[in-house]
Amino acid sequence: MTPLFYAIIFILVLQYTVETVLDYLNAQHYNDPVPDELKDVFDVNDYKKAQAYKKTNYRFGLLTSTFSLVLTLCFLIFGGFEWVDQMVRNVTDHQIAMALLFFGIILIGNDMVTLPFSYYATFVIEEKFGFNKTTKKIFFLDKLKGWLMMALIGGGMLAAIMGFYQLTGPHFWVYAWGLVAIFTIFMNLFYSRLVVPLFNKQTPLEEGSLKSKIEAYAKNVGFELQNIFVIDGSKRSTKANAYFSGFGREKRVTLYDTLINDLEEEEIVAVLAHEVGHYKRKHIVFNLIASLLLTGLTLYILSLFVNNPEVSYAIGVSQASFHAALIGFGILYSPISEITGLILNRLSRKFEYQADDYAKATYAALPLITSLKKLSKNSLSNLTPHPAYVFVHYSHPPLYARISNLKK
């Protein structure tokens, strides 16, 4: 067992400890007095239901995170990675095939082990609180489709990156970065057209009052909008959402059918105005560029360490390899990922305020406020999160902060 092995153990335990403390602090705020501007979000019964939902998820989250830590530590300490590595070496000596088998066994194995937790969360917790609309058929089909996409896309990307590594040595990161950049831009453009239909049905928003109001707003702010779709999110959950995707002719707005059912038309337009604000303020382009730059930085740092056998030995294998080094590096690099995540979350919260301000300036504040309250009520959101939890985990400001900003 090498010093890096113990460093990995330390990182895993530290991350678990920090997350557990943050969850505990957040849970202590569940019973805090609700801010005056949010007292109309829940009635007495809904508030009790929201409290019960949060506490149930807190206890279940603690159980799953503890199980995950124990499983990972046992896998490391008792030679799980070495066992899988030797298994794939007995099947093939081709480096790329070996890596694909190695990651396939670990990822699908992990998914199978944690499947009962996912099943319980969906069919017990979400069902109990009235959110779940997923059938068992959809649940397991989603799993199978996810595995298939992981094999085709993830496996293809891994094989290509390893090919670059074998051909170019330490310069592989440049070519890998180029591949990831092309793929990321492609998915930003065509995600809704190619991936979403595998899981959901999308239909154009029908002619009527809502579509007319959306088109009138878009025209008023100079936002070219030809594609407005409704997605059948209600087949999985009662929770609502809306999102903007694509560029140019592939630009589209997608509204969940639950959103249309839960909100008034003016509130839906206000939500759309918020999404348009992200586009107009260049947040989407910024996030794309930031993601690509961080990916490039990560791949460059990986190239500096992937040839160091100690990075492979850190996960307990006896033979150094690209695939073992990837896992070792991923864990060792995770503290840096946490720091960049904090920075990006801070920027994201700032962008949310800017998008809210844009919606307020170009449409109105009141319908956005009422829509945010309804969405929070319908999802039993936490109205009094701990500031430290917000700082680490929230990509959006808490509801009370957004409403205070909109009322300025």
Label each region the model flagged.
Residues T2-A320, P335, I339-K408:
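Polar-ligand-bearing catalytic/cofactor-coordination segments
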Residues S318, G328-I331:
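Alpha-helical transmembrane segments
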